[in-house]
Amino acid sequence: MSRLETFYDVMRRQGITRRSFLKYCSLTAAALGLGPAFAPRIAHAMETKPRTPVLWLHGLECTCCSESFIRSAHPLVKDVVLSMISLDYDDTLMAAAGHQAEAALEETMRKYKGEYILAVEGNPPLNEDGMFCIVGGKPFIEQLRHVAKDAKAVIAWGSCASWGCVQAARPNPTQAVPIHKVITDKPIVKVPGCPPIAEVMTGVITYMLTFGKLPELDRQGRPKMFYGQRIHDKCYRRPHFDAGQFVEHWDDEGARKGYCLYKVGCKGPTSYNACSTVRWNEGTSFPIQAGHGCIGCSEDGFWDKGSFYERLTTIPQFGIEKNADEIGAAVAGGVGAAIAAHAAVTAIKRLQNKGDRP
């Protein structure tokens, strides 16, 4: 197996000082939600561990995961792609095309057998022997199985690879399936979202490269560090929910005052993601902050769960302190009555309080 440069080797070759390198390690620790004590461990890993070869495949998808990934700010995607990893194949970002690109894929698989990470964006269709998605003249499902067999680990980018997403929505004429239905003998890290948050994507890669292991996963295979809590739990509109202050109609007084969007379809109470903490566009905002309810794009089968603007009505009661593992997949899948009751009771109390005022 050929030797790869370490991340620190690459940074020194680029003229980056030791001080800047240590500063980068501190910022990386902060971006991962780790304390300052982890900065030396990250620095040691960057100095001693070789850059990991990554092969990035594309199946049925819209490329929104790649679009999100290249906009990462912490760390910058240029540092990830050019220094931290060795992105040896990605037909969307690489300069080579056609036979040259496929030759690069085969060469990396041969040189780094059992050492490379497979990243998958999109999913494979099974109908008509996979002919609904062709890459390099062959069905994508063949390429996926071929590259996965010698991978050290697999990352499923986005809801397409993790759950199936819109391609697998009813009636699913191509029989698109998530990649875990095809790859059954490799560890898979699911990073759902349509698309996932940029810093979540780079954070997962950084963790794997730094600590040499998969991040802690929940029962559905998602990193707990980013998918351990509901968006509802950390939402800045949560106090309005508890106070029974809701947007009833778009552009009503409640909407203008920034009240809770639960009654106009927000799926935050049943969606596990880091949107309300990490946010989007370098931490600028997220859909709820922009005035639109969460559509639950990181959850399994969200396209087939009714209108984006339909109020949830079957959510079982569970507290803010609960996480995905404690609640379990069954509860997270069956969604609404207690929250609906809570909303009704708090609204009635508000009306009563108004009536008591002189």
Swiss-Prot record:
Organism expressing this protein natively: Azotobacter vinelandii
SUPFAM superfamilies: HydA/Nqo6-like (SSF56770)
Binding-site positions, [4Fe-4S] cluster 2: H232, C235, C260, C266
Matches recorded under InterPro entries: Cytochrome-c3_hydrogenase_C, NADH_UbQ_OxRdtase-like_20kDa, NiFe-Hase_small_C_sf, NiFe_Hase_small_N_sf, NiFe_hydrogenase_ssu, TAT_signal, TAT_signal_bac_arc
Transmembrane helix is among the record's keywords: no
The record's free-text note on cofactor binding: Binds 2 [4Fe-4S] clusters.
Binding site for [4Fe-4S] cluster 1: C62, C65, C160, C194
Name of the featured protein: Uptake hydrogenase small subunit
PTM entry text: Predicted to be exported by the Tat system. The position of the signal peptide cleavage has been experimentally proven.
Class of the enzyme per the UniProt entry, highest EC level: oxidoreductase
Cellular-component GO terms for this entry: [Ni-Fe] hydrogenase complex; ferredoxin hydrogenase complex; plasma membrane
Purpose of the protein: This enzyme recycles the H(2) produced by nitrogenase to increase the production of ATP and to protect nitrogenase against inhibition or damage by O(2) under carbon- or phosphate-limited conditions.
Keywords per UniProt: 3Fe-4S, 4Fe-4S, Cell membrane, Iron, Iron-sulfur, Membrane, Metal-binding, Oxidoreductase, Signal
Signal sequence interval, chain numbering: 1-45
Subcellular location(s) per record: Cell membrane
Self-association state and partner proteins as the record states: Heterodimer of a large and a small subunit.
Named cofactor requirement(s): [4Fe-4S] cluster; [3Fe-4S] cluster
Membrane topology per record: Peripheral membrane protein
GO BP: anaerobic respiration
The protein's Enzyme Commission number: 1.12.99.6
Main location (coarse class): membrane
Swiss-Prot/TrEMBL catalytic activity: H2 + A = AH2
Family affiliation: Belongs to the [NiFe]/[NiFeSe] hydrogenase small subunit family.
A GO term for molecular function: 3 iron, 4 sulfur cluster binding
Binding site for [3Fe-4S] cluster: C275, C294, C297
